[in-house]
Structure formats: structure tokens, C-alpha cells
Amino acid sequence: VEEVQTIRGGLKGLVVGKVLTCEVHPDSDHMHVTTVDLGDGNEPTQIVCGAHNVAAGQKVIVATLGTKLYDGDKEFVIKKSKLRGVESYGMICAEDEIGVGNGHDGIMVLPEDTPVGMPAATYFNLESDWLIEVDITPNRADACSHWGVARDLYAYLVRNGIKTTLHRPDDKAFAVDNHELPVAVEIERPEACLRYCAVTLKGCEIKESPKWLQEKLITIGLRPINNIVDITNYVMMAYGQPLHCFDADMIAGGKIVVKTLPEGSSFVTLDGEKRELSDRDLLICNAEEPMCIAGVLGGKGSGTYDTTRDVLFESAYFHPTWVRKSARRHGLSTDASFRFERGVDPDGQLYALKQAALLAKELAGGEIAMEIVDVQSPELKKSFDVELEYQYVHELIGKEIPHDLIRTILTALDMQIVSENEKGLSLRVPAYRVDVQ
């Protein structure tokens, strides 16, 4: 555990202020010089603001001096500054600057009856929570999720004699509602895509996620987008399996093809960049064109938008080497590629897909419109056996460990004891433990 803190930033240092005056900046055609009452009994605070919609009389959210604001993994501190020769002692904030929404078309303007001086955490009804930041070593891909960390915590508690249960929500509620939107899957490069699962939902309403889901994502440094995209991020962080969602109307020919394209082909990604492809870039395509660089980043136009009604969820196992090389080739690093590069659980695709579909039914009102397609390569890694000698354990750790304690720890870590003799154990290791050899 690297750090334990309250919910990311906890909106600490952010308060409701009232803009008393608002004048055009003497040396800028787009900035304004404001004075703001922060409700602290002191003189009004001078703040230079670049938002086009700031005006006298507004109730706004103000980041006071010393406040930390976050943008993903980055943080910056509000300091006294001088903008075009005018001193500024704080910042009037937009939604996205404090992590409560996506809006950046001007500052947030609050209702007129909002009390001046009210902490932003109170205004947004921010519930108390704790964020535990865990430093994951590069070889522990299995721990890149809440479920993965929970497995290790469970083993630790069991080893220390604390009665503990490990529970993962079941997926028994998953059921196909109709067969109105079938999509076929074809894998042309099975050495690069060892498993591809997909399911469609019809009649979804794309909208903001409920407050509980937005707050979960904001807490861990992710920005809410819409209910469908947020579901994929939530499931990935919870269980370690990256997902991708497509607008089903964009899947020409009703078919997903996992393949490569000729060297030099072009593709425009979600960030608007036109990229020249290698013939070693694995792509998720429809019957006519590419839609996504597998495991790395989606294509422009193939995602979900306000007008989307039918979606396809993808849950796959892409070979770590292929994803790593594509990500580096294009200078991209995403939460999905981070996990695929290190190796996700080869048995985790169906569970994650079902959880996403169930959440989509709950939050977007869709109906599951096909049987899950699950295409696997014979080379897909399953559980495997290793031999462990007690003497090796003693030498590695530097002291002798009782055999019964070794067995307890290994069993708690989901290692199955196949056989045992006086020298050691034969173990069956779950496929998700890519660090075990």
C-alpha cells in the first residue's frame, strides 16, 4: 500500500463564492477581473477569470489558494499569480476542473440561493470514503483491479488466522432477452487474439451515469463520459478485464473481423489522429473497415454517442506482445493497453462481459439481443502445473517456513495442491497468475 487518503482531493479548498464585481481585464480581450465574496468574513478576493460566461451576481465554485486540483494522474496547486499584470488569488472553476462533470464551456454557475462560503463537498453531497493507493509491481498483472487486490488481501488475512470470505457478485441474472441483433465474429489472426467475446444490447439510452457510478470513477481518477462508457471503465477497474463498446449501427455487415491490414494503411483514432498502420497492428474491423486498434484505442466514429441506441460490448484476450508493440508504435498508453500488455486473466472475459451487460440493462434500459459469441484459440492459456520444493522456499525467504503454513498460504492464493511428498508440492496455478513460472 503506497498511500491512503480520503476521496481524491475530497474537494478540499473549494467553496461557494459570489461574484461581486466583474470588469474587463485592462490588457486582455477575453479575461475578466472579478472580486468574489468567499463567505469567510474577509475582504472580497480578486480573481482573474478567462471564462466567457462569468458575470457579477453569480454563485460559483472557487478554488482557494493552496487547493490541489486533479487532471487524471496529474495534480496542480492553486497559487497566487499575475495574469497580464493583474494579481489573482484563486480560480473560478468549470465542472471538469474539479472532477464533477465533463463541462468546460465556461464556469459552473450555481443556483442563486446557494449559501456563500459553503464547502463544495457539502454542496455536491460528497460522501466520506477512503481511497487506498496500491503500488503494483510490473509482474503482478493479476492485481491491476479491485478484485485482484482483494484476492491478495484475503490471502493475507487467512494467513494471519482471521476468518475471512472472498465474494464476487454472481452473474446468474444474465439472460438473453431476444435475438434481434446477432453479430458474427471471425478471427483471422488467432496468434494475436486468443479469445474474443461479444454481446449486443438493443434500445439503450445513452445518458449521464447515476451519481454513485460517477463518484466511483471520479474517486479513482477517471472522468465520467456516459453510462455505457462508464460501465466499461467500472468493470475494468473492478475485475481487471478491459472492455470496449461499439455503436452496433457502425458494424457494417453484422460482422466483427479481427485482423491486420496492409502496411501503410491509414486509420483515424478517437483522438482525431490519422495513423499509419503497420501490418503488425491488430485491428477490430467490421465487414468494410477498421473500427479499433485492438486493446489500445478505438476509432473515430465507432464509439457510443447521444444518438446511439444499440451497442456491442467486446471482451477479449489480446496477446500482450502485440498490444505492447502497437501501443509503442503509435505512442499510445491507455488503461486498457496497460492491462493487456501485462496479461489479463484468460478466463475472465465472459464474467466481465456479463457484468457489463447486466449493468447496461440497469442503467441504460437496453435488452440483451444475442447469445454471447465466444471464439477461442486452442493456444489460449489455461491453468498450469508447477513443482515447488520446500527447500527452495526456505532458501528464497531466508528462513525455514512450516510446511502447513506454506500450504495455507498457497491455498489462500488460489493454488490447488495436486499432490505432495516429503520434498514439496505439485501445484495447479490459475491462468491469471502470469508471474508464476
Describe these PLM feature segments.
Residues 153-188, 363-392, 400, 436:
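Terminal amphipathic helices with adjacent charged low-complexity linkers/tails
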Residues 96-97, 102-105, 112-114, 170, ...:
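Conserved catalytic alpha/beta cores of large enzymes that bind or transform nucleotide phosphates
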Residues 6, 24, 165-265:
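Glycine/proline-enriched, intrinsically flexible loops and inter-domain linkers
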Residues 7-12, 79, 168-181, 231-239, ...:
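A glycine-rich phosphate-binding loop feature that marks nucleotide/adenosyl-phosphate handling sites
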Residues 10, 377-437:
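Noncatalytic alpha-helical scaffolds and linker/capping helices
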Residues 2, 18-46, 117, 214-215, ...:
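Conserved mixed alpha/beta core segments that line enzyme active sites in large multi-domain catalysts
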Residues 1-177, 312, 328-331, 335, ...:
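Phosphate-backbone binding interfaces of nucleic-acid-interacting proteins
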Residues 51-62, 138-157, 221-246, 288-308, ...:
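Conserved phosphate/anionic-ligand binding catalytic regions in large, soluble enzymes, centered on
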